[in-house]
Every structure is written in C-alpha cells, then in structure tokens.
Amino acid sequence: MGSFSLLHWLVVLVIVLLVFGTKRLANGAKDIGSAIKEFKKSLREDDKPTDQLGSTSQSTASGPQQDHGKH
C-alpha cells in the first residue's frame, strides 16, 4: 500500500496529460533540456578562461622581471 504500482503511475500520467496537454509538456521538456545544455556549456567555458589566465599571468610576471634587469 505504501509504494505505487505501475497502474498508479499510468493514472497520474493520464491526469497530467489531461491537465497540461501534450504540447505544453513537450515545450516544458524542451526548455528544461536547453537549460541543462546551457548550464553544461557555461561550466566548460568557465574552465577554459581559468587555464588561460594562469598561463598569461605567468608569462606577464616573467616579462617585467627581464625588462628591469636590462635597464
């Protein structure tokens, strides 16, 4: 009695489809999918600038030290 059977889930699915309609549910699922894609893309983009910042900060830190020795 505590767990739901397959029949219970099918009844819930039919009720949700009747209330919201298939078009609205499809649009909602599509929006969630695109939001997840954008989130993963932003995570990948955040990793790239960190690596680039580390390499440029090392090269700029060594650049002025060499210039001061020549003057």
From Swiss-Prot:
Its main location: membrane. It is found in: Cell inner membrane. One of its GO terms (molecular function) is protein transmembrane transporter activity. One of its GO terms (cellular component) is TAT protein transport complex. Residues 52-65 have a biased composition (Polar residues). The chain crosses the membrane at residues 1-21. GO terms for biological process: protein transport by the Tat complex. InterPro entries: TatA/B/E, TatA/E. It is a single-pass membrane protein. Signal peptide: none annotated. Residues 43-71 are annotated as: Disordered. Keywords: Cell inner membrane, Cell membrane, Membrane, Protein transport, Translocation, Transmembrane, Transmembrane helix, Transport. The Tat system comprises two distinct complexes: a TatABC complex, containing multiple copies of TatA, TatB and TatC subunits, and a separate TatA complex, containing only TatA subunits. Substrates initially bind to the TatABC complex, which probably triggers association of the separate TatA complex to form the active translocon. Belongs to the TatA/E family. This is Sec-independent protein translocase protein TatA.
